[in-house]
Design a protein with these regions (language model features):
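Glycan-recognition and catalytic cores of secretory/periplasmic carbohydrate-active enzymes
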Residues: 1-473
Length: 473
């Protein structure tokens, strides 16, 4: 990536305003056209949203978009839409025991509504605040209950200089919808559900009325994700490149031993599915921000503040560095996988801008939108800690990506197209994405998580331009 060092949030304000304008049109169009009996809109097919996939994991993005739009513009109809749809459709997601997506669905809806109340953006009604907080407490506990232990109890750290016997034990994880053998990179963003519930004073009650600490479980999951889904250039396997991310880790459930990396949606276990890496970048960066609110003694049982912080920071930086240096195009947008079957046909992608209309492999703008927010948050975090050089590098990388996404050919101004952020990919190996006539790879379509994270990114930049900030907690 060629990072633009001169960009500022203020310089992107015209672009973010355009994002909010177009997002409003798309939100209203989808609400008017979508029949909830069809399930949840997931991605577009020939410009129209359709449902597809395993679970209703994108419904929180659909309604969360309305809250984000209200936050950015003050448009009361969007607040009304978000409130009404959340009350009507989201309760089943709060108690859903079969998914790893509580952060996506519930933090995007109940979490955004609570944040707006606490920020004073809307009138504080205690009943509404209590309702959102109860939903978030239950969501965090239900998500935490989807847990299995590993065989690993010894402390571990990706930081080479860590003294022996210190670190965080990768001793368990929240398993994916593939089953208890499966740990997804994506799930790091659902750790928001656990830590928000913890912040609200909640615990998961287990057998014999034993309380289970939700913060500790979130840290445990994060450590296991870092240990097995992220690579640190330490010779773990023949393809161990620092910052590489495997979408999935597979464990033997009889003994808890790690067996192999895998990939549900990427090209292979030994390349990087770029959206999976984006979840790591964003997820670990925002958890670092949350750690600053936690008392040191509350982390002692999982290795201590220094060990947890070092693990989170090295994981985030490794994934960010590989994004910038390893597989991003010059303009900050990655292809869907770092080295898919036909990637060699593209030449050196790091030396030129991404081409969503190429004939070999699709780009994934949604990966860029997710990662950009992580870059901004990590950059802000490091700068506040006095690490200004690294902080500025990541922060400017985030702005560089945003500048690219918030313009053609990625931002959709076509009123006939229901999507906002074009050229995203859902599941390339399964062939789920639309390939236009005369082309060889998917392009020109949007997805609900891409649209949501584009608006979330624009809102963060809008706040930064005004000298403000926001977090999920």
């Amino acid at each position: 990536m060629k990072i633009n060092a001169t960009l500022t949030p203020q310089k992107l304000q015209k672009k973010t305003a355009r994002v909010f304008e177009l997002a409003g049109e798309k939100i209203r169009a989808i609400d008017a056209a979508w029949d909830p009996a069809r399930g949840t809109p997931v991605f577009t097919w020939k410009g129209k949203y359709t449902s597809r996939g395993w679970t209703e994991w994108t419904q929180g993005f659909q309604f969360g978009l309305a809250f984000l739009h209200f936050d950015a513009t003050g448009e009361e109809t969007m607040l009304k839409l978000g409130r009404e749809k959340t009350r009507k459709y989201m309760a089943s997601h709060v108690s859903h025991v079969g998914v790893h997506d509580h952060g996506f669905n519930n933090v995007s809806t109940y979490g955004n509504l609570r944040r707006l109340i606490l920020e004073g953006k809307i009138a504080r009604e205690q009943g509404e605040l209590d309702y959102t907080e109860l939903a978030l407490k239950v969501s965090g506990a239900v998500q935490a209950a989807r847990y299995v232990p590993t065989a690993y109890r010894a402390p571990w750290s990706p930081v080479a200089a860590t003294p022996a016997g210190t670190g965080v034990a990768p001793s368990g994880y929240i398993y994916s919808f593939n089953g208890p053998q499966s740990l997804f990179a994506d799930t790091i963003r659902s750790m928001r559900s656990l830590v928000v519930a913890h912040q609200l004073g909640h615990v998961l009650m287990g057998e014999g009325d034993q309380p289970i600490n939700l913060l500790h479980r979130a840290v445990e999951h994060a450590a296991t994700t870092a240990r097995f889904n992220v690579f640190f250039g330490a010779g773990r396997d023949s393809y161990d490149v620092r910052g590489r991310v495997a979408h999935e880790s597979v464990f033997n459930r009889n003994d808890g031993q790690f067996r192999c990396p895998s990939s549900q949606q990427g090209y292979s276990p030994f390349t990087t599915w770029t959206r999976g890496a984006a979840w790591i970048i964003c997820g670990f960066a925002e958890q670092l921000e949350y750690l600053d609110t936690v008392k040191g003694e509350d982390l002692d049982a999982v290795g201590g503040r220094r060990a947890v912080t070092d693990l989170f920071l090295e994981t985030a930086q490794a994934a960010c560095d590989y994004y910038i240096e390893g597989y991003s195009s010059k303009d900050g947008v990655p292809y869907w996988d770092s080295m898919a079957l036909n990637s060699h046909q593209l030449g050196d992608i790091t030396k030129r801008n991404a081409d969503p209309f190429n004939a070999h492999e699709p780009v994934d703008s949604s990966a860029a939108a997710i990662a950009a927010q992580g870059f901004l948050r990590l950059g802000t975090y490091l700068t506040a800690k006095g690490e200004t050089t690294a902080g500025k590098r990541y922060f400017q990388a985030g702005l560089t990506i945003a500048q690219t996404l918030f313009d053609e050919p990625y931002l959709s101004a076509d009123p006939r197209h229901q999507g906002l952020l074009l050229h995203s990919v859902y599941h390339r190996p399964n062939g789920w994405d639309h390939i236009p006539a005369g082309r060889k790879v998917p392009c020109g379509e949007a997805c609900m998580w891409g649209d949501y994270h584009a608006v979330e990114l624009a809102l963060l930049i809008q706040r930064l331009a005004a000298g403000q900030y926001y977090t999920f907690f």
